[in-house]
Amino acid sequence: MQALLQEILDHVHPLLAQGQVAQYIPALAQVDPNQLGIAVQSLDGQLHCAGDAHTPFSIQSISKVFSLVQAINHSGEDIWSRLGYEPSGQAFNSLVQLEVEKGRPRNPFINAGALVICDINQSRYATPTLSMRDFVRRLSANPRIVSDAVVAESEYEHRARNAAMAYLMQAFGNFHNDVDAVLRSYFHHCALSMSCVDVARGFAFLANGGLCPHSGEQVLSRRQAQQVNAIMATSGLYDEAGNFAYRVGLPGKSGVGGGIVAVVPGRYSICVWSPALNASGNSLAGLRALELLSERMTGSVFSAIS
């Protein structure tokens, strides 16, 4: 496994020069694009990694999965009265669709949907930022995970479009808490700093029917884990989810920090990171690495069982 992972990283390394780090978040624009790491966590506890797998990075939209799981934990099916689970077919920060559909976001992985989920969690937790941090620490078995205050503040200073979404949803009666407070929580979630190892371990419960393999905690029911994986498969990579399903064939979630996490139900959770992005905001080398790994080792969830 170790040799295979290193071989894949060597193969995709030339792609680092073809992507570009996220420019619209100033703190992320300073990240060295020549970094590349991968970690594979098996359900029997084995961890395999290569490259910069232990280097922390800003998980950004990967945090939307953790937020969704928190909301499902305390509110269950009730959350779907406020948002859907359909692909949007629009940019992740589109206002047009939100206006047409009267403030009800298509799914929890576009920005408007993630803000609704944060609004739901804001009503539940006295300190949402700390609750999220502690939740992620528990899932990843790493008590040192923190949110990068510099990144969070950088995002807050460029909050206009996200604030516009929140106020638009508030106008339609679908946003209940103080907009500024929810935005603060949202940006601190996005600014969580985790390594490939942390993320792969933190998502292992979704490969294991909702059961965290290292702690024995039933994070979600088996059915709920299936549902989260389904939304990741249809909506997890911005407007490139179809491409990811076609090329990789696994439930996944990406972030503009360059991370992509993927789940192989019953087998593995995987995280790859390279901050050089393609035009859709997904890691260029990361996508190709996961495609090669799917071909060589994991297989697609759409494959026939042999």
From Swiss-Prot:
It catalyses: L-glutamine + H2O = L-glutamate + NH4(+). It is an enzyme of class 3 (hydrolase). Its EC number is 3.5.1.2. Pfam families: Glutaminase (PF04960). InterPro entries: Beta-lactam/transpept-like, Glutaminase. One of its GO terms (biological process) is glutamine catabolic process. Keywords: Hydrolase. It comes from the Bacteria. Substrate binds at S61, N111, E155, N162, Y186, Y238, V256. One of its GO terms (molecular function) is glutaminase activity. Belongs to the glutaminase family. Homotetramer. NCBIfam families: Gln_ase, PRK00971.1-1, PRK00971.1-2. HAMAP family: Glutaminase (MF_00313). This is Glutaminase. It comes from Pseudomonas entomophila (strain L48). The lineage of its organism: Bacteria, Pseudomonadati, Pseudomonadota, Gammaproteobacteria, Pseudomonadales.
